[in-house]
A protein has these predicted regions:
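Short acidic, gly/pro-rich beta-turn/loop elements at beta-sheet edges
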Residues: 13, 66, 126
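Secondary-structure boundary elements
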Residues: 9-13, 50-58, 107-113
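Active-site metal-binding core of divalent-cation-utilizing nuclease and nuclease-like domains
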Residues: 24-54, 58-64, 68, 92-93
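Acidic-basic catalytic patches of nuclease active cores, encompassing PD-(D/E)XK
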Residues: 1-34
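Non-catalytic C-terminal interaction segments of nucleic acid-processing enzymes
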Residues: 108, 115-138
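Generic detector of well-ordered alpha-helical segments enriched in charged/polar residues
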Residues: 4, 16, 80, 84, ...
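Accessory terminal regions of nucleic-acid processing enzymes
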Residues: 9, 77, 81, 137-138
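Catalytic cores of nucleic-acid endonucleases
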Residues: 60-120
Length: 138
């Protein structure tokens, strides 16, 4: 994440190009995304970083992507439109990788994109990401 703090990191266009962004993207750390709920309200989830329309979750030191009760996750307006929920990673009572599910829904609601940055020495987190994304519809 430190690279995004460096002044002028987007100036020459190379980093922007790798991320599919226009040059001079502005970093917005701790971005409060608005994820629509079925009742018309919003969940104000914090995403680690927003660059233009790209939301980024950096998982560098935490052990997992958290879990949440199924009832909590099912209240998101676009949940059934975005995910094949039957096959998401889950236990009897909880969906696993809740942060990923919520942030994918945040990107979907804003018409943006979402990516995960993690340490290559944490293959279990990469597997968690793939387990969620292969259940995204469309």
């Amino acid at each position: 994440m430190n690279i995004f703090c460096s002044p002028g990191v987007f100036r020459n266009g190379q980093v922007s190009s790798i991320l599919g962004l226009k040059p001079n993207a502005i970093s917005n750390f701790g971005f409060l995304a608005r994820v629509p709920l079925q009742n018309g309200r919003f969940d104000r989830t914090e995403v680690d970083l927003r660059l233009s329309d790209l939301l980024i979750e950096a998982k560098l030191t935490e052990s997992d992507f958290q879990r949440a009760p199924k009832a909590t996750v099912r209240v998101y307006r676009d949940f059934n439109e975005v995910f094949d929920s039957e096959y998401l990673p889950q236990t009897e009572s909880d969906y696993l990788s809740y942060q990923l599910i919520r942030n994918v829904l945040a990107a979907y609601a804003s018409g943006g994109e979402f990516c995960v940055l993690t340490d290559a020495r944490r293959p279990e987190l990469i597997e968690d990401w793939y387990a969620v994304m292969k259940r995204a519809l469309g």
